[in-house]
From Swiss-Prot:
InterPro entries in the cross-refs: Fmt, Formyl_trans_C, Formyl_transf_N, Formyl_transf_N_sf, Formyl_transferase-like_C_sf, Met-tRNA-FMT_C, Met-tRNA-FMT_N
Name by which UniProt lists this protein: Methionyl-tRNA formyltransferase
Enzyme class: transferase
UniProt cross-references to NCBIfam families, sorted A to Z: fmt (TIGR00460)
Protein's organism: Parabacteroides distasonis (strain ATCC 8503 / DSM 20701 / CIP 104284 / JCM 5825 / NCTC 11152)
Length: 324
């Protein structure tokens, strides 16, 4: 079968999923429909509906779009069957019921932003950086009953530099993933379906690191950690949702502070953990047990994000605070 004859239904929602869809469209593959989330209410009183990034791209190139509220809704399933897909591709969408992923004759494959079986879950890029990994990657795998556990089709590896954050890794994986999606389609067109069970990639489930969804409490900095761990934590949450702490004044006043960029400065010292040290012009150092975290870009609650010089110009009393 030629790629022009293979009927593909694509499922995805955020920016990360746009690149793979674009690669399929521009590569001449036959995308017959796109499934994405319903438009999201925005603005005051939810009066404005914001379409997903995938919908915006799909509409711009004239692709049919379906936006089901419920994936088991019979009206949606009838519309999906009418597309007569040979293959479904999922990139950053949602968990599919079997009635959906088992519909096409070639099955449904997913692009996941980790080297499965590591980092199964909703936030694989964040957790790889938070944990200080020096490598991550992308995986295509067939969907099955349990989330992120299906047979692996192909993987590509990406080094993580010590200066990378979630944004840089996300963008690199987005481009790499788009290439892997088209490569995977080509393999399936050639009849090469030698997918490998994930159990062959590890000996003990205890070796596996999860990638659970990140909540606000997840992002709170623990200043009792080593400086490298805190540094990795900051870059693993930057720019979104951002690591945060509280500035605590001598009288107990607390101000929420997001930290977007920092430097790790290992050193021996006798300062209390959480104490703040600054020249009031160009740097803020927070003492931790094995050094200092030098803050580079931050944001007080209710204020805009600032570099350290601008922040110090407007916050002269910073040294009177500690962090916690």
């Amino acid at each position: 079968m030629k790629k022009e004859d293979l009927r593909i239904v694509y499922m995805g929602t955020p920016d990360f999923a746009v690149e793979s869809l674009r690669a399929l469209v521009e590569g001449g593959y036959n995308v017959v429909g796109v499934i994405t989330m319903p438009d999201k209410p925005m603005g005051r009183h939810g009066s404005v509906l914001q379409p997903s990034a995938v919908k915006q791209y799909a509409v711009s190139v004239g692709l049919p779009v379906l936006q089901p509220e419920k994936l088991k809704d019979e009206a949606f399933l009838e519309e999906l069957r009418a597309l007569r897909a040979d293959l479904q591709i999922v990139v950053a969408f949602r968990m599919l019921p079997e009635v959906v992923w088992n519909m096409p004759r070639l099955g449904t494959f997913n692009l996941h932003a980790s080297l499965l079986p590591q980092y199964r879950g909703a936030a694989p890029i964040n957790w790889a950086v938070i944990n200080g990994d020096t490598e991550t990657g992308v995986t295509t795998f067939f969907l099955t009953h349990e989330i992120d556990t299906g047979k692996i089709i192909r993987q590509r590896h990406l080094p993580i530099a010590d200066t990378d954050d979630v944004e840089t890794v996300h963008d690199a994986l987005m481009a790499m993933g788009a290439r892997l999606v088209t490569e995977t389609v080509d393999l399936l067109l050639d009849g090469k379906t030698d997918a490998i069970p994930q159990e062959e990639f590890y000996k003990d489930a205890a070796e596996l690191r999860p990638a659970p969804k990140i909540f606000k409490d997840t992002c709170h900095i623990d200043w009792n950690q080593p400086v490298k761990n805190i540094y990795d934590f900051v870059r693993g949450l930057s720019p979104y949702p951002a690591a945060w702490t509280e500035l605590i004044s001598e009288d107990g006043k607390r101000l929420a502070l997001k930290i977007y960029q920092a430097e790790k400065r290992p050193a021996e010292h006798n300062f209390p953990v959480g104490s703040i040290h600054t020249d009031h012009k160009s740097y803020i150092d927070v003492a931790v047990k094995d050094g200092f975290l030098r803050l580079r870009s931050l944001q007080l609650a209710g204020k805009k994000r600032m570099n350290i010089t601008d922040f110090l110009n407007g916050f002269k009393q910073i040294a009177e605070y500690t962090v916690g």
